Amino acid sequence: MKKNTLLKVGLCVSLLGTTQFVSTISSVQASQKVEQIVIKNETGTISISQLNKNVWVHTELGYFNGEAVPSNGLVLNTSKGLVLVDSSWDNKLTKELIEMVEKKFQKRVTDVIITHAHADRIGGITALKERGIKAHSTALTAELAKKSGYEEPLGDLQTVTNLKFGNTKVETFYPGKGHTEDNIVVWLPQYQILAGGCLVKSAEAKNLGNVADAYVNEWSTSIENMLKRYRNINLVVPGHGKVGDKGLLLHTLDLLK
């Protein structure tokens, strides 16, 4: 892995003990539909959904305040191994996710990027460390993780950090406070895919969701910073809900009004 830090400031078939079928990604714009492959575990609590040959969305069903909530991250299939954006709700789900993707792609998970210190992102940190997987985060996320009783990720990401995993380029960006004090987003420049995490709401979201640690008055500015930095977005992956396009950022701004 090379690192350069910037800025100081349905048809169903059996596959790998899972279920594969054809589905679609819903966009904010109804005219944009992308056919995809979805692979699920036997219980339906974990799925990976193909965005392109090398980028998949991983989704796990966890529970928040007694309600079942699906949470999204990314799986990057690089020439040097697999990289995840976010772990999962807990160590059990994270362990099963790792085993599932390693079996599917016949590669090891080498690195994970943690986008903030809530359970749906960092809940599997112990499972990562047990496997020797590098867990990248900002220093603030590492600090907040420790305060919440989690093992600490590396704390090696700056305001903007450019990473390279084999042939795959990744940029992490801290646009400012919003869903949490520490939320970052992940940009894949080769594919123009933005993993917005919980800072970005899905098209079907009617409200801002969990705002217990939110900075609602600063959230809009952070979204605007993302729009200024990433002007040519192909797909946006929200922390929860369906994949969309740039319209998800605009929808989030509407919810903040």
Curated annotation (Swiss-Prot):
Cofactor: Zn(2+)
UniProt-listed Enzyme Commission number(s): 3.5.2.6
Compartments in which it is found: Periplasm
Any Gene Ontology CC annotation: periplasmic space
Role according to the record: Confers resistance to the different beta-lactams antibiotics (penicillin, cephalosporin and carbapenem) via the hydrolysis of the beta-lactam ring.
Quaternary structure annotation from Swiss-Prot or TrEMBL: Monomer.
Family: Belongs to the metallo-beta-lactamase superfamily. Class-B beta-lactamase family.
Protein's name in the database: Metallo-beta-lactamase type 2
Originating organism: Bacillus sp. (strain 170)
